[in-house]
């Protein structure tokens, strides 16, 4: 069993190493600018990427940075009203060919928003239509058929959490912000009695 996990860890590590650091740095800088100018970062996905998006939003707001989740399906049925001029919208799609994501992207391009794509395919409809692309490589999903959204969603989570942490670091967010927003649970107790350690 350990050999399975070791193999998948290698897959995930290799995928993360395929990240273009210059592109990621640009993404972080634009994320900082988005938040600093009073706008928000919206992340959009569907299927198994939904909880990944929600985790990113939860991390962002827990340190006082405005973020929202926009379901790719319901976006074009009225939910796109959450998108305002100046916002950043991150679209998650492994293939870049998901019809719902393409439809959403084309409508977002009519607005004054900063669109980013997080994907695993360098050549796709969306990589051709969206100029800001974070493109990762992935050889194997880790399931029996190499088709289930398994390793790809894990990698999306790692990348988005990294984006959140880097934006927070660049903005100089202090532990007091997290303490104010997270009074509950064991974390809240640890923060309130000062027993946490950097």
What are these regions (language model features)?
Residues 39-171:
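Glycine-rich phosphate-binding loops that contact phosphosugars or nucleotide phosphates
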Residues 23, 42, 174-178:
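Secondary-structure transition/capping residues
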Residues 4-5, 24, 56, 69, ...:
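Phenylalanine-focused residue identity feature
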Residues 1-37:
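An N-terminal, well-structured beta->alpha segment
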Residues 128, 142, 168-198:
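Internal, active-site/partner-interface "lid" segment
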Residues 4, 19, 23, 48, ...:
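Catalytic cores of large soluble enzymes that bind and process phosphate-bearing ligands
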Residues 26-29, 51, 182:
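Amphipathic alpha-helical interaction segments
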């Amino acid at each position: 069993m350990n050999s399975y996990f070791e193999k998948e860890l290698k897959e995930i590590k290799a995928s993360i190493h395929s990240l273009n650091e210059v592109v990621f740095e640009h993404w972080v800088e634009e994320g900082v600018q988005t938040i600093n100018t009073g706008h928000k970062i919206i992340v959009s996905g569907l299927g198994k990427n939904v909880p990944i998006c929600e985790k990113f939003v939860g991390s962002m707001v827990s340190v006082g940075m405005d973020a929202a989740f926009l379901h790719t399906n319901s976006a074009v049925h009225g939910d796109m009203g959450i998108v305002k001029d100046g916002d950043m919208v991150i679209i998650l799609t492994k293939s870049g060919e998901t019809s719902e994501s393409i439809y959403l992207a084309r409508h977002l391009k009519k607005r004054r928003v900063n669109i980013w794509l997080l994907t695993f395919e360098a050549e796709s409809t969306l990589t051709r239509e969206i100029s800001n692309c974070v493109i990762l490589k992935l050889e194997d999903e880790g399931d029996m058929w190499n088709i289930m959204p398994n390793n790809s969603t894990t990698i999306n989570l790692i990348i988005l959490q990294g984006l959140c942490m880097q934006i927070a670091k660049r903005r100089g967010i202090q532990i007091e912000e997290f303490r104010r927003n997270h009074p509950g649970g064991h974390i809240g107790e640890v923060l309130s009695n000062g027993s946490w350690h950097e």
